[in-house]
């Protein structure tokens, strides 16, 4: 019998008519993850996750939700006392003034064989880490503490509602709190790539 070969995994982003993102996200057997991307929005924080499917027949829309084998709520490694999806990864990546990201992270719960055939998705906006609110500098502000005008702008920017919709404060807060524990309110999907075996 031949010797079993240990492989790493890689997701390769190729520019398309919809976005100019290119580069790789590489997953190693020891949990190391190398993110090397360009073509992102300069000086912007983008959410990044592993999604459950590698189905790109409908673009990034058919990649499913976050990879979540344990069936828990969305969270972050920054808050270890809270549950998190395995696919939440580092939640966010920060692009330089040239739209470039070069980051290294460690995700001990990401098993290479379990993510093959799934996808890495980059989102337009920032992941709120499942905290049901946002940070303004170092100060945390829950969605229930935001003004109605802030809430409307935040929700419309995430395509939850349209301008002119008659929505009250409670409806918006409930939607944002629900999505915070599901998607991190990360906004639309701007780029995706299937995770496959890496040659190296």
PLM segments and residue spans:
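N-terminal leader/targeting pre-sequences
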Residues: 1-200
């Amino acid at each position: 019998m031949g010797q079993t070969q240990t492989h790493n995994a890689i997701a390769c982003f190729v520019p398309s008519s919809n976005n100019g993102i290119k580069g790789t996200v590489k997953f190693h057997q020891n949990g190391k993850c190398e993110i090397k991307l360009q073509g992102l929005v300069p000086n912007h924080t983008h959410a990044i996750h592993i999604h459950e499917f590698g189905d790109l027949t409908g673009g990034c829309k058919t990649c499913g939700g976050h990879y979540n084998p344990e069936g828990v709520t969305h969270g972050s490694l920054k808050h270890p006392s809270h549950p998190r999806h395995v696919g939440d990864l580092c939640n966010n990546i920060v692009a330089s003034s040239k739209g470039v990201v070069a980051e290294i992270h460690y995700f001990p719960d990401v098993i290479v064989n379990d993510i093959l055939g799934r996808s890495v998705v980059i989102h337009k906006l920032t992941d709120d880490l499942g905290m049901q609110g946002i940070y303004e500098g170092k100060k945390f502000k829950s969605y229930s503490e935001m003004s109605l005008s802030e809430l409307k702008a935040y929700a419309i920017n995430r395509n939850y509602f349209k301008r002119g919709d008659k929505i009250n404060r409670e409806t918006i807060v409930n939607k944002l709190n629900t999505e915070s524990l599901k998607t991190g309110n990360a906004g639309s999907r701007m780029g995706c790539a299937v995770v496959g075996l890496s040659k190296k």
